């Protein structure tokens, strides 16, 4: 993150130095940041080619207005976009007509309908269940929370389980969910949760048990956005759209490097070297 800020608290990428996920960026390197757009687009193409894509979003500040930072990731790459909207058009534009096999996200409506199947983040739903429990529901939420934690435990054990065993667990969990949805909570929050699960979630809870390369939670997407949340609080955002786009490209390169066991410094240097290497070979 380029964390050096101006007197009004807004970050400018032309400042003398800063940091990218804790990495110092020297003055001479900042002029090269425009060169990272092409490597970032190669990362986007890698994510689009994946059968399983996970996505999340968090707010950003650009020229004093609320924008949104989106992340689209697969096992080996993460692409960041900072856009003026939280609408469905952002993932639609990112995909460019591609339809992956599975999409992993929270329950935001803008995240729906982009893949053949959808896996809701079970960690989010476990928190929703705990909220209903804290507000007095004893009929649906406690058992629903236990069911989701059971599903996550099966997910962690998949490396040691045969495909047939995983399929049996999925059928068992689906039967238990069906019985749970027959319950009638009397507490308001319990009813809201049960109705939401019945209407929107019942076919999006255990999709990850159909694929070994899918996860039950969206924790990796949240982790990819965490440095940006800190950045927003420290700097109060960007004074230009150019700065926001450059920062998103940097996030793409650094987080993709992390997923491939490369340091932020190595990932950025490799990205900046790519155009020169291609030119040399031309």
Regions found by a protein language model. Give the residues of each.
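Catalytic center-proximal scaffold of phosphoryl-transfer enzymes
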Residues: 1-282
